């Protein structure tokens, strides 16, 4: 029993964050091994994912009927992680889906504060969190983008960060057709 209420609350929050972090990681690793590849329409998956958010600030430009072979639930999880981050830090979000040569390109732009360019690669490291000033009130365990990157790479793809035309962050996901 801890008498200091502030210390007790902080410890409780830290324990909750650790539990969330472990659950996210366990869920990711178990689905990696159990889910089978299937052919699915990624434009439909993105459309359905966006619709679940019921957010009028998300706009989209998707080419229809783009099929890929992969683990659909993992791809959806990666999309959710990116969109969740955008919603946390931005007001306006644009999602795009295009094809170029043998690649599917998913682009997520937002008008949030963005991430300093020198941090672009760091945010994909497990448990890495940007400094507290970026989002002190935002709950994060530092696994979302790490898991997202692992999912994309496990499908033979790549994920990069850039400055968005909306002045926030642009996340570009490349997946093989």
Give the positions of each predicted feature.
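Short beta-strand/loop element within the Bergerat-fold HATPase_c
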Residues: 92-102
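Conserved catalytic submotifs in the C-terminal HATPase_c
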Residues: 59-70, 100-101
